[in-house]
A protein has these predicted regions:
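Short, surface-exposed secondary-structure edge patches
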Residues: 50-54, 227, 266
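RNA pseudouridine synthases
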Residues: 1-185, 189, 294-301
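Conserved hydrophobic positions within beta-strands
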Residues: 82, 175, 213-216, 249
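Active-site flanking residues adjacent to catalytic metal/cofactor-binding acidic residues
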Residues: 92, 240, 251
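Short, surface-exposed loop/helix-turn segments at secondary-structure junctions
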Residues: 201, 250-263
Length: 303
């Protein structure tokens, strides 16, 4: 365990505890220290405080960082469709049916297993979790572009952009029904479903702010081909928002009772493009993943 004590200088008078500690250890994220504080690993004058505690000059802040728990997830030689790669990160085109981080019932065949094999020891280890390199995720049955970070510095840099909603994330999807408006915005908070814990739902009371912009690309007799742009990245955001306006995603059995004429494995949703400031060059870059063949086949059939 790493343990260090710092005396607060005058310039940090009134600073929040979590922000102060994240300044001391810039290689880690602020959320990392918020969890550390919540777990009682940060004290002020030998007393555990909350993350929003305001510091005073000459306060003694003690930080205890537990040793990272060795992951039990094993590398697996799973082919990856790599759209871009350098020393700081890679962008992969995730296939349908692949889980991103390991979870109950999915400890093998995940994206983490694949990138551990591909990158060896070159993956970020933020929070010491069993999800090395993973800075964001997409649902198991959603395909498309996803960033993987190779070191903690790039992880923190990309995570901060995601937190500030400055990452450009555009999706393509096919929904049930004919969407009337050419474009629009859905601004509705999303939280856990009150009854079905597998689902998310519009939750005005306890939900987190969620904003989805949409644009119609093509209309068919019973379906609409659309583009979505996310301002926020809540769990199942596009799926919940579109279902809330009566146009759930084709194949999405969790949020729709609609019958699909196609044999689908989950929702017809693809993370088409991701744009961000590169942590090394500090320049904006944009990576796009081509539509998967099953998606193209449905479009050809509808046309």
């Amino acid at each position: 365990m790493q343990k260090e004590t710092f005396e607060v200088e005058y310039e940090y008078e009134g600073e929040r505890l979590d922000k102060y500690v994240s300044i001391l250890f810039p290689e880690q994220s602020r959320s990392f220290f918020q969890k550390l504080i919540k777990d009682g690993n940060v004290s002020v004058n030998d007393k555990v405080q909350k993350a929003n505690y305001r510091l005073k000059t000459e306060d003694l802040v003690t930080v205890e960082i537990p040793d990272a728990v060795e992951t039990q997830i094993l590398p697996e030689d799973i082919p990856l469709d790599i759209l871009y790669e350098d020393d700081d990160l890679l962008v992969v085109n995730k296939p349908k049916g692949m889980v991103v981080p390991p979870s109950a019932g999915h400890y093998s065949g995940t994206l983490v297993n694949a990138i551990m094999y591909h990158c060896k020891d070159s993956l970020s280890g933020i929070n010491g979790e069993i999800r090395p390199g993973i800075v964001h995720r997409i649902d198991m049955d959603t395909t498309g572009s996803l960033i993987v970070c190779k070191n903690d510095e790039s992880h923190v840099f990309i995570a901060e952009q995601i937190k500030e909603h400055s990452v450009n994330r555009r999706y393509r999807g096919i929904v049930y029904g004919v969407v009337r408006d050419d474009e629009g915005t859905i601004h509705a908070p999303i939280g856990r479903h009150p009854v079905d814990r597998k689902k998310m739902a519009i939750n005005e009371k306890n939900g987190k702010d969620a904003i989805t912009h949409y644009k119609v690309l093509e209309r068919f007799d019973k379906y609409t081909y659309m583009e979505f742009k996310l301002e926020t990245g809540r769990t199942h955001q596009i799926r919940v928002h579109m279902a809330s306006i009566g146009h759930p995603l084709l194949g999405d059995t969790l949020y729709s009772n609609g019958k699909s004429p196609y044999k689908l494995q989950g929702q017809t949703l693809h993370a088409m493009t991701i744009g961000f400031i590169h942590p090394g060059t500090r320049e904006y870059m944009e990576i796009s993943a081509p539509l998967p063949e099953y998606f193209e086949k449905i479009l050809r059939d509808l046309r």
